[in-house]
């Protein structure tokens, strides 16, 4: 839709944006990561001004950092930017040229998420446990990913599962609730998993209890261990760690 609108409008550049308040995590991310966020002032569909790291409250036209433009124009701007020592496309190339270039806005109204820290990663993933968000994000278009042929997930007698998204190759003997499990996760008998995101080949051993945990690949939570974060501060376990 954005590409079609860009062609039909004759714009030099079309920028996708959403109407929403600036997310709190985005406001504070610059001090930690030098990440810049952008908002637009609109005159009809034309972007008349681009603001960098705006502190305005209320609903804004927030950039999605998605732009459609002709290949040759992009090449020309990159060459000029290289000579001038520019570093940021939006700040150094587009923002100074809102009068020179025809920069049009495209409002995106579907599901979108801005992930810039562990908290937002956890929150946005957990939202996918709601059918309306999942259906909006995966709306029939194919998803291309790495192929790993595996067995269907097995739920052993006595296991319990409630409101979960589980990939193939998992073995569930314990209890899982409000959680997302990547491929090959194993939850042993007597283990309890709640409000967690467990990445590929994580192993939760017998009797372990975890809550509000994000585990990277190949993590093992040892037998009988308890590990609990909170919804505002999920615990992260790095790749290959044994807890």
Predicted segments — roles?
Residues 72, 80-243:
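Left-handed beta-helix
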